């Protein structure tokens, strides 16, 4: 603990609140004749000089290899955006993704980021590939239903010089204060042939929002408040054959949303399938249910005081989320009966892009269980054009009537990361008291104190056979509160990637205490992993495979897995994932698992799977 504090205190002089850079203004253009969103940028709105023509490589700051032009204008209903993307090798234009909301990371695409509050904190992101497929990121919005997220228009067209895009983003999607005359805006293009992202202006490898253009002289329409209701009926065989439910989302203000769910349709939501690979501790899995993801109420670290996947059924749920200036808050209450109730409240204040403080509480009532947990947390750091470094802390305290269940978790540490040829690092001290208990939370290791650490370094190249490489070193040293060793590890890994393939390898050693037939045992593990990936530029036929082998938990261990995408026609696509585990010794087992998915694209917005 003293060692960690000394290092972090030494870093404080260089980790300070960074001053905003001088603003770059771009006057807004209001149009009386709206452009037609068909991908053809011959409309009169785009015949003036472009707003942006200088694009820069995200990682190095070098000028973009191909010319790109971007325009933006608006009227009383929409924000209109256009891109002209020149391509000297038009046959290389890649636009495989056809499903709206699908990943565009391997395609040629353009993107616009809008900061309506001009606080450099909450970005709206809109992407369109060269086929016209759309995807967006709306701050604090969960779920995938367009009715829930808000609709917008886009189209793309292949041109003799390359390709072009038009977008129409309704003002009603954005949240902004009345009489807002300045917003932040930035433009991006991904070039698949070089696997580069270019931006205008140059935001650096960390997409520093403080460097966004100031879109000035705006006269947006008065903000509107929207209420959305989605009702559903599920029919089935056996047991309850009919179930009806209702989801309602209401904007209380431009900064606050309320959500009500009654008999939510959780069973039709695909959750992540847990791996069969051996682990000493429970895995922390993500939750795809929109009621829980809306507002990003979950904590990001592994020891979570609120872990929504522990709540399986909900009869009625109410949630309020929002942002007020630099304050981000959420409140959640749900119940599946009078004796099963869950409450979660969280508030966070952001000061700049990195610095923050906050607090949270949970309260759980189940048959035979009554439990409360409180938390305070904070972060102080510095973000520059090339990297971000910060120190942070969190303290959680649990209260449970009766004996036991009154403990705490303390976490103190720091982290730093940047672009190519920048050293990444992290160092944390964790103290998890064995008396700590969170009925709606998860703690993979409920009794430990010690440090975890790591560092990485790598580089990227715009041409050549090797496009990226990196090396990583990480480890931890954890003791039980009794003073006995819980776990001590050291891992090393390396990765080399070309434009379309990847090879990676790692080796690690760990001493780990666990129980075998209620007898504490100290295992000496060592594991090798080697893997590769192929067709990484292909949307539907890419794949990867790796194997891990060595000693684990007192026996020999072998674990292998492979994933392959298949294109079965213009509209049929499949993914097959297979994993196999074989172990000897106290935890001897032999298991395998196949996860297969088949999708048929009916339209760009609807599919059967």
Regions found by a protein language model. Name each.
Residues 5-17:
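Hydrophobic h-region of N-terminal signal peptides that target proteins for export
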Residues 18-344, 348-349:
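Structural preference for beta-rich elements and adjacent junctions enriched in aromatics
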Residues 77-79, 122, 163, 179-183, ...:
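Outer-envelope beta-barrel architecture signal
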Residues 85-87, 116, 169-171, 189, ...:
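Short beta-strand segments enriched in hydrophobic/aromatic residues
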Residues 202-222, 338-374, 379, 383-384, ...:
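Outer-membrane beta-barrel transmembrane domain signature of Gram-negative proteins
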Residues 234-236, 245-247, 263-267, 334-337, ...:
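Conserved short loop/turn motifs at secondary-structure junctions
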Residues 275-279, 376, 411-412, 442-444:
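Short secondary-structure boundary/capping segments
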Residues 313, 388-609:
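Exposed, low-structure sequence patches enriched in small/polar residues
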């Amino acid at each position: 603990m003293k060692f960690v504090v000394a290092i972090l205190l030494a870093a404080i002089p260089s980790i300070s609140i960074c001053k905003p850079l001088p603003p770059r203004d771009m006057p807004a253009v209001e149009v009386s004749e709206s452009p037609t969103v068909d991908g053809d940028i011959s409309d009169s709105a785009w015949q003036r000089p472009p707003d942006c023509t200088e694009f820069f490589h995200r990682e190095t700051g070098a000028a973009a290899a191909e010319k790109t032009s971007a325009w933006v204008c608006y009227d009383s209903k929409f924000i209109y955006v256009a891109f002209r993307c020149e391509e000297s090798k038009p046959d290389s234009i890649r636009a495989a993704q056809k499903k709206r909301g699908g990943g565009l990371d391997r395609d040629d695409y353009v993107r616009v980021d809008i900061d309506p509050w001009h606080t450099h904190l909450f970005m709206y992101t809109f992407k369109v590939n060269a086929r016209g497929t759309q995807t967006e990121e709306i701050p604090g919005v969960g779920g995938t239903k367009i009715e829930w997220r808000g609709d917008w228009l886009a189209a793309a067209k292949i041109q003799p010089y390359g390709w072009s895009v038009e977008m129409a983003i309704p003002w009603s999607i954005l949240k902004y204060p009345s009489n807002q005359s300045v917003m932040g805006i930035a433009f991006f293009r991904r070039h698949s042939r070089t696997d580069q992202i270019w931006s205008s202006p140059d935001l650096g490898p960390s997409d520093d929002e403080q460097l966004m253009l100031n879109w000035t002289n705006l006269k947006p329409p008065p903000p509107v408040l929207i209420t959305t209701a989605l009702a559903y009926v599920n029919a089935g065989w056996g047991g309850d054959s009919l179930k009806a439910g209702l989801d309602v989302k209401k904007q209380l203000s431009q900064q606050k949303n309320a959500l009500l769910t009654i008999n939510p349709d959780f069973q039709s939501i695909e959750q992540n399938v847990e791996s069969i690979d051996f682990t000493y501790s429970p895995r922390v899995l993500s939750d795809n249910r929109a009621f829980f993801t809306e507002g990003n109420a979950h904590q990001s670290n592994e020891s979570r005081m609120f872990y929504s996947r522990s709540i399986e059924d909900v009869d009625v749920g109410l949630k309020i989320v929002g942002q007020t200036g630099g304050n981000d808050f959420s409140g959640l209450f749900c119940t599946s009966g009078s004796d099963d109730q869950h409450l979660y409240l969280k508030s966070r204040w952001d000061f700049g892009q990195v610095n923050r403080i906050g607090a949270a509480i949970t309260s759980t009532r189940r048959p035979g269980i009554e439990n409360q947990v409180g938390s305070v947390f904070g972060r102080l750091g510095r973000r520059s054009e090339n990297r971000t470094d910060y120190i942070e802390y969190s303290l959680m305290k649990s209260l449970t009537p009766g004996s036991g269940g009154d403990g705490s978790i303390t976490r103190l540490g720091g982290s730093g990361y940047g672009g190519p040829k920048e050293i990444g690092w992290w160092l944390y001290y964790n103290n998890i008291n064995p008396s700590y208990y969170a009925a709606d939370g998860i703690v993979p290791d409920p009794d430990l104190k010690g440090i975890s650490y790591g560092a990485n370094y790598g580089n990227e190249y715009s041409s050549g056979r090797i496009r990226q490489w990196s090396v990583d070193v990480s480890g931890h040293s954890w003791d039980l509160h009794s003073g006995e060793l819980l776990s001590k590890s050291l891992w090393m890994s390396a990765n080399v990637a070309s434009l379309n393939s990847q090879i990676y390898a790692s080796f690690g050693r760990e001493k780990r205490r666990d129980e075998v037939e209620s007898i504490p045992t100290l295992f000496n593990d060592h594991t090798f992993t080697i893997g590769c990936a192929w067709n990484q530029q292909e949307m539907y036929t890419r794949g990867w495979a790796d194997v891990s082998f060595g000693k684990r938990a007192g026996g020999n261990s072998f674990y292998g897995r492979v994933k392959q995408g298949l294109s079965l026609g213009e509209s049929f696509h499949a993914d097959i994932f297979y994993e196999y585990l074989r172990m000897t010794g106290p935890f001897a087992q032999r298991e395998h698992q196949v996860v297969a998915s088949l999708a048929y694209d009916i339209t760009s917005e609807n599919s059967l799977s």
